[in-house]
Amino acid sequence: MQRVRRLGRRLRATPTAVEVHHGRGPGSQGDVLFAGPLPPAPTGIATYDRAVLEGLDRIGFTDRVRMETLWPVGTQDAGRFPGYHLGVFQLGNNVEFHLEIYRAAYLTSALVVLHDLALDDFVRGLKAAGEPLGYMAAREAGRLCDELTDPDVIRNEPLREPWCAHVVRRARGVIVHSDFGRRYLAGFGVRTPVFVVPHPAIEGPEAFSTSAPRGRELRASAGDPPFLVVAPGDMNEAKQLDALVRSASVLGTGSHVAIVGRRIEGYEPEAAIEAAGAAGQVSVHADVSDADFLAWLAAADAVVDLRFPHRGEVSGSLSRAMQAGVPSVVSATGTYLDVPDDTVLRVAPGPTDVSELAHVLARLRDDAALRSQLGAAAARHAEHLRTREATARGYERAITETLALVRDPGRKAMAIWGKSLVDAGITEDMVAQGFGMEYARALRSFEPGPEVAASQRNFERSP
C-alpha cells in the first residue's frame, strides 16, 4: 500500500496538460523517438531494447532515419513528444518502468510495442493511483471482453479482458512478437496495423561458447548431476515452479533442478522446495549476473519454461535457451504454440500436471539423441532469425510503414470526414452504397504518383 500511495503522490504532482510551443510540431525534434528501458534497468525489456537498437544500427536504419533514444522517461519530457513524427513506445506490465511511456503514447503518433498482451497489473496500478488513463483503459477492456472467445484466451484469466485495447486502438501501429499476439488483437476487433516481429537475439553464439567454462563450474556447484534442468527467468507463480519442484522429487536422484533468475516480490520458491522435501534436488540462484545466467543455460541438459496463467508474452529466456541449443519444455498455450514444433516439447495448458511434467523430463533424461535433436533444431532456428536480422528488419518495416501513414496529408482529413459521417448518422451500409465517397475519392489526389513514390522509396534506402 505504501508503494501505491507513493505512486499516487507522484501522479497527482504530474501536470495533466502539456504546453506545446509554436515551431515544435511533428518533425521539429526528429523523425522517430524510441522510448523504453535500457540497461542497467532491472527488467528483461532493457536488454531487449538494447538488442533492437544494436540491430537497427547494424542494418543502417539509423543512418537513414533521424531516430533518438530516450531513457529514463520522466514527466519533464512530456513536451518533447509532439516534436516527433512517430514515437516507438515499449510497453510492459510494470507501472514503475512504463508509466511515462504509456502517457507518451497519447501525446504523439505512436508505434506501440506490446511485451505483454495483458496489461492488467499496469492498468490496476494506474487506477489505484487515480490516473484517468487507467479508468479509460479499464472501461475499454470491459466493453470489449465479450468479443474474446478463443478457448486458449478464456483459460488464462489475465487475457480475458483486453487491457491493452485502449492504447492499441489509439496507436498508429502495433508490434507484437508472435502470431498469437496478432490473433489476440484481431479477436476484439483491432484495426490498427499489427506487425509481428520476432524477439531479438540478445547475444551472439560466441557468448554461449565462452560461457561454457563457467557453466561447468556452476554445474559442479550443484553436485555435477547426470541430468541438470534449469528454470530460467523471473521467479513467479505463473512459471509453475511449484509443479517443477514436485516433479523433481518424482524424478529422483541423478537429476537436479536449478531455479535461476530475478526474485519477484510475493513469491518464494523455497517454500515449495521445503514442502516437497526436495532440498537436495532443487537449488535456487537468485539475482545472478547476466554472465552467470548465460552460464547456467550453457550448462543445462534441459530448460523448463512454463506459463499459467499466460499473459501473451514471448519468453526472452526461452529465446536464449534456444540460442544455446538446449531442449526446452514449455506449456501448450498462447505464444508457445508459435514456436516450431521440432524445437520444444510441450505439456498440457493450464495448471501443470506434476506427473506429466515428470514424464516429459524423464523422457529427455533417458534419451540423449532426443535432447541433441531438439537442441540442434532450436539453435538452427535461433541462428536463422539472427543472421537474417529478422528483428531489425521487422522494426524497419513497422517504423517505415507507420511513418508513411502519419505523414499522409489525406489521413487526418479522412479521419475528420469519417467522424463527421458517423455524427451525421451514416452507417457502413450507407457508405457501401456511396454516401460520402466523393470527398474520399477527392482526397486520393493527395497520394503521390508512381514516380514520386518510387523516388521516396529510393531516398529512404539511400545512406
Language-model segment annotations:
Residues 2-24, 380, 384, 388-463:
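C-terminal amphipathic helix plus adjacent low-complexity
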Residues 34, 223-239, 245-248:
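Conserved donor-binding/catalytic core segment of Leloir-type glycosyltransferases
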Residues 144-145, 269-291:
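Nucleotide-activated donor-binding/catalytic signature segment of Leloir-type glycosyltransferases, i.e.
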Residues 154-194, 201-203:
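A short, active-site helix/loop in glycosyltransferases that binds the activated sugar's phosphate group
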Residues 172, 297-312, 326:
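Acidic donor-binding loop of glycosyltransferase active sites
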Residues 232, 256-270:
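Glycosyltransferase donor-sugar binding loop
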Residues 327-331:
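Short hydrophobic beta-strand element within catalytic cores of glycosyltransferases
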